[in-house]
Amino acid sequence: MKRIAIFLFEGVELFEIASFTDIFGWNNVVGLKEFRDIKVETISYKESIKCTWGGELRAEKIITEDNVENFYEYDALVIPGGFGKANFFKDNDNKIF
């Protein structure tokens, strides 16, 4: 199984996340059989994330200093876009990142 992490940060755009969950979700249903086993999970430094236009998301996995090495097990890391600079660069300053 391939594992893909989508990193959520304050100000992320919902449609930028949806494109990945939709593509890989449909791939698991109608894609070529040898590529169907993909698991997508959302990760962040905190449980609740506020999106650009007021939506709120809950991360499936929370990154902490104690478990940061577990996140090296993902096969790919997706960093979706946000409005302007959003707050990705604030999260980028997090010493865990």
Feature roles, as predicted:
Residues 1-97:
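Extended, subdomain-level signal for the structured scaffold at the beginning of enzyme domains
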